[in-house]
C-alpha cells in the first residue's frame, strides 16, 4: 500500500526521539533521516538533529533534486561514504549544496539506503565535521550493520504510524489525524486520568490483560520506553481524545 508522507510534527518528533535514543551510545553523531517519494521527489520529509535552519534551507530549496548524496542513493542499495568516487567524481555542478555543507562545517559523511515497497527512498545520513571526520567515520564503519538495521526499524516505525493514522482517519468522520484505535484511545484517556489497569478494565468491561495488550501496542507505536512515557507524550501532544463514561461492555 502506498503511503502519503507529510510533515506531521508528532510523528517526526516520535521518530526523532527514537533515533536519538538509539544513537546515544555512539556519541555525538549528527544525522539526517530523509524520506522521498521517487515518483514525486518534491514530497520529502527530513528528520534530523542538525540545526533547524539547515533543514529548512534544504527543504525550502528542494535540494534533494541536486544533492549528489540523494542522487547516488537512488541507484544504490548498499551504504556508501560521501568521499566515494560515485559522489565526489560527479561531473555535475552541485555548488549550492556543497556551499551549504561548508557553512555548517560538513566535510564528509556516510549514508545508509532503503527502498521501500511504496516507491519511497529512505536514507539515514551521518554528517562529519572537519575536526572529527576521521573519528566519526570510524565509529560508523565499525557499526554499519547496526546502523543499517536502525534505518530499517525507524522507517518501519514511521510507515506504521502513518498507516495507522490514515486508517483511523478514513474510519472516522473527524478529519483530524489520529494514530490510535478507538480502544487504544479509551485506555490512554482513562490512564491519563490516573486510573489503574484494573480500574480501566472495569470501566470498559474488558480484562486487565487486554488493557495491558493495548498499552503495549501504544508503546510500540510511539517508540517510547514504557507506558508512563506513552501517556505523558499523548497528553503533551494532545493525541488523546476525551471519552464519555460508559457502562461495562463485552
From Swiss-Prot:
GO molecular function: DNA binding
Residue span, HTH luxR-type domain: 173-238
SMART domains according to UniProt: HTH_LUXR (SM00421)
Entry keyword set: Activator, DNA-binding, Quorum sensing, Transcription, Transcription regulation
Pfam families: Autoind_bind, GerE
Keyword Nucleotide-binding carried by entry: no
GO biological process, one term: regulation of DNA-templated transcription
InterPro entries reported in the protein's UniProt record: Sig_transdc_resp-reg_C-effctor (IPR016032), TF_LuxR_autoind-bd_dom (IPR005143), TF_LuxR_autoind-bd_dom_sf (IPR036693), Tscrpt_reg_LuxR_C (IPR000792), WH-like_DNA-bd_sf (IPR036388)
Portion annotated as DNA-binding: 197-216
Recorded family membership: Belongs to the autoinducer-regulated transcriptional regulatory protein family.
Function: Functions as a potential ohlL-responsive transcriptional regulator.
Protein's recorded name: Transcriptional activator protein EchR
Species of provenance: Dickeya chrysanthemi
Amino acid at each position: 500500500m502506498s503511503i502519503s508522507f507529510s510533515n506531521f510534527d508528532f510523528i517526526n518528533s516520535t521518530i526523532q526521539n527514537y533515533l536519538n535514543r538509539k544513537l546515544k551510545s555512539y556519541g555525538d553523531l549528527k544525522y539526517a533521516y530523509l524520506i522521498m517519494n521517487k515518483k514525486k521527489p518534491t514530497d520529502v520529509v527530513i528528520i534530523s538533529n542538525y540545526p533547524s535552519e539547515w533543514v529548512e534551507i534544504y527543504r525550502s530549496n528542494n535540494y534533494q533534486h541536486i544533492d549528489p548524496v540523494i542522487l547516488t542513493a537512488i541507484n544504490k542499495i548498499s551504504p556508501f561514504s560521501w568521499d566515494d568516487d560515485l559522489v565526489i567524481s560527479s561531473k555535475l555542478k552541485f555548488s549550492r549544496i556543497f556551499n551549504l555543507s561548508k557553512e555548517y562545517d560538513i566535510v564528509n559523511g556516510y549514508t545508509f539506503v532503503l527502498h521501500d515497497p511504496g516507491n519511497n527512498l529512505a536514507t539515514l545520513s551521518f554528517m562529519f565535521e572537519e575536526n572529527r571526520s576521521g573519528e566519526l567515520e570510524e565509529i560508523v564503519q565499525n557499526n554499519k550493520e547496526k546502523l543499517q538495521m536502525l534505518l530499517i526499524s525507524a522507517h518501519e516505525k514511521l510507515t506504521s504510524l502513518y498507516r495507522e493514522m490514515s486508517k483511523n482517519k478514513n474510519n472516522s468522520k473527524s478529519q483530524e489525524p489520529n494514530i490510535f484505535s478507538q480502544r487504544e484511545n479509551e485506555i490512554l484517556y482513562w490512564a491519563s486520568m490516573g486510573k489503574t489497569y484494573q480500574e480501566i478494565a472495569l470501566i470498559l468491561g474488558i480484562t486487565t490483560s487486554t488493557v495491558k495488550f493495548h498499552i503495549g501496542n501504544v508503546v510500540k507505536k510511539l517508540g517510547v520506553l514504557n507506558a508512563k512515557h506513552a501517556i505523558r507524550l499523548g497528553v503533551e501532544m494532545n493525541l488523546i481524545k476525551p471519552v464519555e463514561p460508559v457502562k461495562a461492555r463485552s
